[in-house]
From Swiss-Prot:
<keyword id="KW-0805">Transcription regulation</keyword>
<keyword id="KW-0804">Transcription</keyword>
<keyword id="KW-0479">Metal-binding</keyword>
<keyword id="KW-0238">DNA-binding</keyword>
<dbReference type="GO" id="GO:0008270">
    <property type="term" value="F:zinc ion binding"/>
</dbReference>
<feature type="region of interest" description="Disordered">
    <location>
        <begin position="273"/>
        <end position="318"/>
    </location>
</feature>
<dbReference type="GO" id="GO:0000978">
    <property type="term" value="F:RNA polymerase II cis-regulatory region sequence-specific DNA binding"/>
</dbReference>
<dbReference type="GO" id="GO:0005634">
    <property type="term" value="C:nucleus"/>
</dbReference>
<dbReference type="GO" id="GO:0000981">
    <property type="term" value="F:DNA-binding transcription factor activity, RNA polymerase II-specific"/>
</dbReference>
<keyword id="KW-0539">Nucleus</keyword>
<dbReference type="GO" id="GO:0045165">
    <property type="term" value="P:cell fate commitment"/>
</dbReference>
<comment type="function">
    <text>Transcription factor that acts synergistically with tal1/scl and lmo2 to specify embryonic dorsal mesoderm to a hematopoietic fate.</text>
</comment>
<dbReference type="InterPro" id="IPR039355">
    <property type="entry name" value="Transcription_factor_GATA"/>
</dbReference>
<dbReference type="GO" id="GO:0000122">
    <property type="term" value="P:negative regulation of transcription by RNA polymerase II"/>
</dbReference>
<feature type="zinc finger region" description="GATA-type 1">
    <location>
        <begin position="180"/>
        <end position="204"/>
    </location>
</feature>
<dbReference type="GO" id="GO:0045944">
    <property type="term" value="P:positive regulation of transcription by RNA polymerase II"/>
</dbReference>
<dbReference type="Pfam" id="PF00320">
    <property type="entry name" value="GATA"/>
</dbReference>
Length: 364
C-alpha cells in the first residue's frame, strides 16, 4: 500500500478508516517534522469539522519516524513513496494549510525518553539553547520538561503517570547518631533528655525522672534486703546482718534467726547453729525429686499382691459404662479394649465392686 504525503499546496483532505471510523467529535494531535520555518514539535487540537484531519479509532496506528539527518529538516514538497510504512514521515509539516496554530505546546519529558536528541541539536546549537530557556514544569509531573522536538514513536514514560515523589535521604536513615550519655545505648524506642539537654535512652530517662539520679550501669545481682543498723548487734549471736531485726523478751535486739528460734522453743538459739550466710526459703528443687513426682501415678490402684498384670493399666478402676466419658484422658489401642483371652488352665479371677471399694479377688 502506498502512502502519499501532503504538500503545502494541497488542502488537507479528510482521511478516515472504514473499519476504524469514529463518529464522535474527536481531537487529534498533529505532529510535524520540518525545518526552521516549521514548528519543531507541537500538537494542535483541531476539530474534525472545522479543518479536515486524520481520523481513526482510539487504537493508535502510528509508525516510527526518523530524525532528519541535518538541521535543515525534510523538504516541504515530497513525492509518493512505495516503501514500507516504517520509513515514511507520517505527518509532514502542514503549517501553511492550517495557518497559525495557537494551541498550547505538547510537553515532552526529556529525562524519561528512551532515546537521545539529534546530534545537530546538542550543545552549541542555537536551537538547543532556546529549548533550555523555554523549560517549564508539566502539570502532570513535577519534573522540568523541555520543549525540544521529540519523535512521537518514542515511548514517553512521563505521560504514563505522575513523577515519583522525591524523599529526602534522611527519612531512610535512623535519627541522628544519638548516644545515651549514661549507658551509651544507640537504639531505644524513645529518646529523652536530661536537665542539661543531653540525650538519654528511654530506660535511663525514666530512671532519672523517677529517682532523680543516673541509672546505675552495672545491674546489681538479686540479693536479699539486709537490714543494717549502725552499731546494732544481735544480743545472742552478736551478728550485725539480718533480714529482720527482732526483740527478745527483755527488749534486746536479736537477729531474725535467733528471734524465731526463741519464739518456737523458748530457748536461746545455740551459737553452734550460727552460719555465715543467710539461708532463705527460695530453695531449688532437686532434680531427683522432680523425677520421682513424674514417675508417680495418682491413678494407679493399690497393689494387693494377688492381682495379675492387666493389659490395660486402668482396667480395675473403670466400669464398662465409664469408658466413653474418660476418652479424653485415655487413648488405648483398639485391641486393648477387648477383654483379654484367658487360657482354660488359668482360673478366672472375678472382682467385686462395692461402695467401700474393690474387694480382694476370688478364684472361681
Amino acid at each position: 500500500m502506498d502512502y502519499t504525503t501532503l504538500t503545502t499546496q494541497d488542502p488537507l483532505q479528510n482521511y478516515t478508516e472504514s473499519a476504524l471510523a469514529s463518529t464522535s467529535e474527536d481531537s487529534e494531535f498533529l505532529y510535524g517534522l520540518g525545518g526552521e520555518n516549521s514548528p519543531g514539535h507541537y500538537g494542535g487540537i483541531v476539530s474534525s469539522r472545522a479543518v479536515g484531519g486524520f481520523r481513526h479509532s482510539p487504537v493508535l496506528q502510528t509508525f516510527p519516524l526518523h530524525w532528519p539527518e541535518t538541521s535543515a529538516g525534510i523538504p516541504q514538497s515530497l513525492t509518493t513513496y512505495g516503501r514500507s510504512p516504517g520509513t515514511l514521515p507520517l505527518y509532514p509539516s502542514a503549517a501553511s494549510a492550517l495557518g497559525s496554530i495557537t494551541s498550547p505546546p505538547l510537553y515532552s519529558a526529556t529525562p524519561f525518553l528512551l532515546g537521545s536528541a539529534p546530534l545537530a541539536e546538542r550543545d552549541g546549537s542555537p536551537k538547543f539553547l532556546e529549548t533550555l530557556k523555554t523549560e517549564r514544569t508539566s502539570p502532570l509531573t513535577s519534573d522540568i520538561l523541555s520543549l525540544e522536538p521529540r519523535s512521537p514513536s518514542l515511548l514517553q514514560v512521563g505521560y504514563l503517570g505522575g513523577g515519583g515523589q522525591e524523599f529526602s535521604h534522611s527519612l531512610f536513615q535512623s535519627t541522628e547518631d544519638r548516644e545515651c550519655v549514661n549507658c551509651g545505648a544507640t537504639v531505644t524506642p524513645l529518646w529523652r533528655r536530661d536537665l542539661s539537654g543531653h540525650y538519654l535512652c528511654n530506660a535511663c530517662g525514666l530512671y532519672h525522672k523517677m529517682n532523680g539520679q543516673n541509672r546505675p550501669l552495672i545491674r546489681p545481682k538479686k540479693r536479699l534486703i539486709i537490714s543494717k543498723r549502725a552499731g546494732t548487734q544481735c544480743s545472742n549471736c552478736h551478728t550485725s546482718t539480718t533480714t529482720l531485726w527482732r526483740r527478745n523478751a527483755g527488749g534486746d535486739p536479736v537477729c531474725n534467726a535467733c528471734g524465731l528460734y526463741y519464739k518456737l522453743h523458748n530457748v536461746n538459739r545455740p551459737l553452734t547453729m550460727k552460719k555465715e550466710g543467710i539461708q532463705t526459703r527460695n530453695r531449688k528443687v532437686s532434680s531427683k525429686s522432680k523425677k520421682k513426682k513424674q514417675l508417680e501415678n495418682p491413678f494407679e490402684p493399690p497393689k494387693t499382691g494377688v492381682e495379675e498384670p492387666s493389659p490395660y493399666q486402668y482396667g480395675p478402676l473403670l466400669f464398662h459404662g465409664q469408658m466413653p466419658t474418660m476418652g479424653h484422658m485415655l487413648s488405648p489401642p483398639h485391641h486393648f479394649l477387648q477383654s483379654p483371652r484367658m487360657s482354660h488352665s488359668t482360673p478366672a479371677v472375678s472382682y467385686r465392686y462395692s461402695a467401700s471399694g474393690v474387694t480382694p479377688p476370688e478364684l472361681a
